[in-house]
Amino acid sequence: MAVTFAGQPVTLKGETKHPGDKAPDFKAIDRDLNTRALDEFLGERFTVISVVPSIDTGVCDYQTKHFNKTLNETDGVNVVTVSNDLPFAQARWCASAGLEDIVTLSDHRDLDFAHNYGTLMEEHRLQARAVFVLDSNKKIVHVEYVDEVTEHPDYDAVIKLLKA
């Protein structure tokens, strides 16, 4: 899979996922520095894992706000945002955005998520932009690795799937 960052090819490390795959477990750090696991965030129907390079960039900011605000009232759907930002940066962003109740997880320590989902941009030690939708049995039903990391994912495809 060819992915670019600001027009330059990057190497993705880890195991690429596809629809039908079982979502691998992972551990990441929450804003209170607690180690958390995927099973803690599974929705009754679906879980959206929104992966961003850095919460402090415009596209990542929009992606995080858009998925959380749009899907907030969709029954049985949980949204989790994963980045390599430090938990303190995620907490600051959530407070400034007025979104203290959303779930953000930092993969900065062990890169466990990145290795399990194939999102590590080796050259930058950042996550590639991606979206994974899991059903309640942890089966991946939608995957998007965004070809150009500085671009937006296909929000409509995810929202259409979840609101059907």
Indicate residue ranges for each PLM-predicted region.
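Chalcogenol-based redox active-site neighborhoods
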Residues: 1-164
